[in-house]
Amino acid sequence: HPQELSDEVLYAIDQHVMKGGQAIVFLDPNADSLVTRSPQGAMIPAGMGSDLEVLLSAWGVEYQDDKVLADNELALRVRMSQNGRPMPHLGMVGVPREYFDQEDIITSRLETVNFASAGVLSQSDGATTTFEPLIRSSYDAMLMDAALVENMTDPSILFDEFQSQGTSYV
């Protein structure tokens, strides 16, 4: 979950990639791992997403830090309370191997990868860099406002906003 990286670190990463090195980029519009709890047990959102805008722009990659992937086909069933019944959560997806690049060593032996509040990447128009997606969503997916998914206590509400775009996202 890259945040507030120094100019020196950003430069080192950029030089590695520009010299032919590869980078695997995972970006997080909602930093779920940084959520804390108040003394009363209430969730306090971190309010911070990943930020690599300078590098992504230079590499010809687009990322919307205010959007998360919502996928109806791959939605995980979650229990939001101890006594609640499991229900699909569009912002939490379990991606099986058929959505992976089976030719790449990084993903070829994986079975399933789970994501919560996943960011989405795309290649910029006119980009000259090579953009090789390793994991894709289903086509029954859309981009949803990150603020709507953040701190969600009733995932059924997401279905009110969901309109599949017929697009597979990276």
Task: Label every model-predicted segment.
Residues 1-170:
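Acidic, S/T/G-rich, low-cysteine, solvent-exposed domains in lumenal/extracellular/periplasmic regions
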